[in-house]
Amino acid sequence: MVLELILALPLLGGAAVAGWRDHAARWLAVATNGATLALGVWVAVRVVRNGPLTGAEGVLRADALSAFMVVVIGAISLLASWLGVRTMALEVAGGRCSPRRATAYGVLVQAFVAAMLLAVLAANVGVLWVAVEATTVVTVFLVGHRRTRGALEASWKYLVICSVGIALAFFGTVLVYLCALRAGGHSASALDWTSLVAGARHLDPSVLRLGFALVVLGYGTKVGLVPLHSWLPDAHSQAPAPVSALMSGVLLTVAFYAILRFKAVTDAALGPGFSRTLLVVVALSSLAVAASLLLTQRDYKRMLAYHSIEHMGLVALGAAAGIPLAIAAVLLHILGHGLAKSVLFLTSGEIMAAEGTSRIDGVHALLARRPTLGGVFGTGLVALLGLPPFSLFSSELLMARAEFQVGLGWAAVAALAAMVVIFVAVVGHARHMLLGAPGPTEVLAPPPAWVAAPLVAGLVACGLIGVFAWPLSGLLHAAAHVVAP
């Protein structure tokens, strides 16, 4: 029953926003996301102690990997919905959005959260595919929320490219299903994760290779991996800041969760060699593209979007190593990246509302003029660049250690070279935005405490996880063994 409740909570929040159309209803939606996080933590503790939970007559299943992703979704959706209250209030007050569209925004955000939760709780690869497709449909409208020419172009580009990716993922899923049927699986259970992993040794290797390649290419589109990554900077730069936080902070990793699930099946059938080679190629290509594009970036929201491509490349490279240490580090990286990136996108929304531009050269002396926003933005970039004490520092070290253990040291060195280029590029952009002397009348009032508090809390959580990761160690260990038994 608890898994059904987790799915119902964001839908109840959306119903409250749709039915009441009141400011208080938006805070009720925030509360439902907080309850989702709390239930996710409870499920995680329960699963680590007693094993997987099932629900909805076997349609839903939560093992350690699913429970971890529910916690990530709950945390990021809580941050995004909290700041979303302010975002919509400012847009309505400024005449950029009607109350009706603000209501639609609130409903769509809650539907988006519900679809992501369904994706990670699905016991069936077909339900997973439907849920990921649902995230595409919902977020198309969220990307185009402002209805400007740029927003509409970005939403159409997102729809077309991600639809191609989802179609490829569908064909890959069908091939895996056909493999399971030919291996003697029952049609009713051939799509279940547990059945696929248990019967992996009997799957046709050649068909499975093609199926997994299509899955990586298809779901990799939603992850933002090369080659079908071009939708990501446009969508992230045009969407409202809370939507960008949800997309970059958690949607990308929900799609990567699907790749991890199929990787477990493929490795059980073929060994780790095939998936390792494929993921290394995709990862290093993504890192190279992110490094080259960040050097010439002029828009700080697009800068953050390209940084997402870098981090998804690092996650893919860590997953390529495939051993439990690597998968645990990947999951720690997913959580740290989600917290840091969501805080940065939410802060960028505040900066854009205050400065009236998203261009890097249009913002200066933030630390002096707007010390709260400048401090949060600068600290968030420190976290995102993988510097201590934040959790991304720990996860990147652990991934590199695992890569050297399995003979991928050369790939880790190549990734480090790309990261150095990215570090130099981002520091240069941040220097322009954060430093400088303000004019005599340019020191402005900080945002309200209720706006700054969740931003600071997200960064504090990212730092604490980097220093005190032991509360998560049992969950990370159990989740890693789901992918790499």
Placement of each model-derived feature along the sequence:
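Transmembrane helix-loop-helix hairpins at membrane boundaries of multipass inner-membrane proteins
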Residues: M1-L5, L9-V107, S187, T194, ...
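Hydrophobic transmembrane alpha-helices and their helix-loop junctions in integral membrane proteins
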Residues: L79-A89, A114-G126, V138-L397, R401-H432
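Alpha-helical transmembrane segments and their helix-start/interface "positive-inside/aromatic belt" motifs
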Residues: A18, D22-N33, E153-G165, R370-G374, ...
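Membrane-water interface of alpha-helical transmembrane segments
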Residues: H23-V30, E57-V70, P99-G106, H202-R209, ...
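Cytoplasmic/organellar membrane-interface segments at the starts of transmembrane helices
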Residues: L175, S189, W193, A239-A241, ...
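Alpha-helical transmembrane segments
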Residues: L7, L11, V30-L39, G74, ...
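Hydrophobic alpha-helical membrane-insertion segments
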Residues: A31-V41, C162-V174, G380, A457-W470
